[in-house]
């Protein structure tokens, strides 16, 4: 089971502004995974062992307190709403954007000993369509499923 927390300015708009993440959801489903997407304002509904968050969904993922095997963050935002990664999270991959070019949004930094940071430089809205990052995500999830976290 995988939960995706979408981005968006107000939450409800995530299904429109996070089409790239919904594309990732479809790729995961084709690979046989059960995947549910939530808007960032409904982050408390997430309860899967694998959490993927984009933009506001990425920052909200850091607020989750239940056990998480793998958390993958796509340019979490806003940066000032990021929480240090808790001990409830086994592994984190953060696609940290060095130049999000989105009027102060994007560029969140994941902090914790279990964080692997992948530096990227893309416009914030475009990062969700980056197939090379989606391929990394798919690989990380497959490795976790095989027990190689």
Predicted features, each with a name:
Residues 10-11, 84-149:
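C-terminal catalytic-base region of ester-bond hydrolases, centering on the histidine
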Residues 14-21:
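The serine-hydrolase catalytic nucleophile loop
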